[in-house]
Every structure is written in C-alpha cells, then in structure tokens.
C-alpha cells in the first residue's frame, strides 16, 4: 500500500525543516568560528607586535582599515629608532629613524587565517631612495596560512632582485626566499635560499661575487629565549679580486651547529665546517687549501649562564651584564674538544686534535692574572706533512726553526708535535714553550 499523500507531504516538509535547521546551525557555527578566528587573530597580532618591540627595540604599530567577520586589512608601520640603529653601529646614533609601511591583508575562515604582507615602496623614509634607484616595483613580502584547529603555521617570505648603478660602480642583489613550518608561537623549522650578489667597485678595482647560499634551522623557545637546537648552511661559491692580482676563491662551504642539553644544569654545543677548496693568490704567493674540516665541541656549559648570556646579547645591553653572564658560565668551567681540524695546504696534509679543560674561574682571573691561566689544562696533537715547507715555501723558515728547537719531530713521514697545557705551563714535545 502507498502512504497517503498528506503523509508524503508532511515527510518532505519535515526533511526541509531539518535541512534548514542543519544549514542554520552550520551558518551560525561558521559565523561564530569566524568571529572567534578574528578575535584570536587580533590577540596573536598584538602579542607578536609587543614581543617584536621588546626583543628588537623596533617600534611596530598596526592601523586597521577594514575589519569584519571575514577580513582584517590594514597597515603595519615599522620604525627603527636612532638608539636601535646605534646598537648596531655607533656612528648611526644621530641619524634619522627609518620608517617603513607594509600593506597587511588577511582573510578569515572558520579556524583558518591566510595573510599577505608586502612593503609599500611609496611610503616611509625609504620611498624617496627607492624612487631614485628606480625600485618602485621592488618586493619585500611574506604570506602565511595559520590553522587554529591544529595551532600550526606555514609561511614563506621573499626579497626580489635589484641592481644599483652609480657611475662605473654596480651592485646586484639576487632573489632571496624562505619558508617556515611550525606552531603559532614560532617553534618550528626555518629555511632560506639566497641566490647571491655581485659587487663591482671601479675606484678600488674590487670585484666580489657570492653565489647560492642556503640555510636551515630548528627554532625553539626555551625558558623565554629563542634558541636554535640545530642549524646548517651551505655556500656554493665566493670570490674576491683586488689590485695586485689578489684573488680569493672559495667553493663548497658547509657548516652545521648543534645545541643539546647534557642534564638539567649543563649543555653542549657542537660546530662543524667543511671547505672543499679555498684558493688565495697574489703576485708573490699562492696557497690552495683543500679538504678543510673542523669539528669542535664545547661541553659542560652552565645552562643558566648560557641563557643569561644569550638574553644579554640579544638585547644589546651594557657590557657589565654580558660580563656577569660570562662569569656565571666560567664558574662551572667547560671542556673544549677538538675532534678534527685538518686540511691540505698545496697538497700537503696538516691536522690538529685534542681537548682543553677550563676549571671554574672568573673572567677577570682568566684575562688578567696567572691564577686564571692555571685554570687551563689540555693536550693537543699536531701532524704536518713532511714536505709542507716545500709545498708552502713561506712556511719553510718557521718549520725549520721549530724543528731545530725540538718543537717539531720528524716521525713516520710527518712532522709531529705534542702541546701540553698544565695549570698555565705550556710544553711542546716536553720542552717549555718560550715566548
């Protein structure tokens, strides 16, 4: 049997009512989520501005132009005052403040924010300079996507290329870009890639070129300080030419740093560097360094002292605060471990390994008295190719003198030295080192 027609109509009507109710709930929920997203955006922006001003000394103000459930548009004004400029270079103490304005546009969806930031080249104190240089189309900007659901952020930033010519002098800046993946507080992974730059100075007859610099770093806030537990960088090539046939070329530079906690009170840092080739030439000399390697660790650093030093350095406070932080670190002592310092100089191998220990002391004692030197102890081993003097003639007189004094010993086709530091006394191959 078929249901009565009026029952069918009531069923369809009920479905429509349910659909309308569900739709209304979704719309209201979406609008509520957008309202919440907008309020959260306002709070996060205010917190980030306050943090930027506190940590950098740069003044940042936000002037909203359009505010509704789905939009936050306005202008970010950034001012670098003379006192902040002077902290980087004392000669800038009396200069005028640098003012920049950025167009800041954000689109709000439920629990999702997409933002775009770009320098307005027609505003601020840089505008006349950029106009004179023909850089009205130059871009300095960033865009980001933030999720309040996962409390995550994905951003990218860029600086476009430009060229400045003045007479026969020329400066070329190639594009730079990077990205960030992490949380809304700034804990995450940052990468950057700069294609490089070239400089030609006709007056000094100097040419400089830097090509393909890449870097990445893990960022983390630890006890209120921004630290990088791990970072790395690579530089493909660098060259510098100056009058007198002076030329320096570098290829294949890589670096890596690591910061780890030993326990609740101490930490260790490790720095590694590799150089494929470094050539230095002049009219008189030529030195080729290949297979360069450095592996250096500092262990047992006082955690509280290290954090205080980082905070003092980042805020560019007076020297007394920095010295106080150094004293805090020195009171615990530390160990320097040189796992490897090696290279080939014009084909001949040279290397240095060992470790040095610093007993608890103070900065004043370490720098200004024999008592501070007594806090140092360690043992280093040097190995030099026996033909180093032939390969690098400018080193030959020194090598001959050290060999005659017993500071270098010929052994197993090498020149070897053992440098021992014991409570301030230095010996080389068991012989006291004379100043």
Q: What are the roles of these predicted feature ranges?
A:
Residues 5-33:
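Gram-negative bacterial Sec-dependent N-terminal signal peptides
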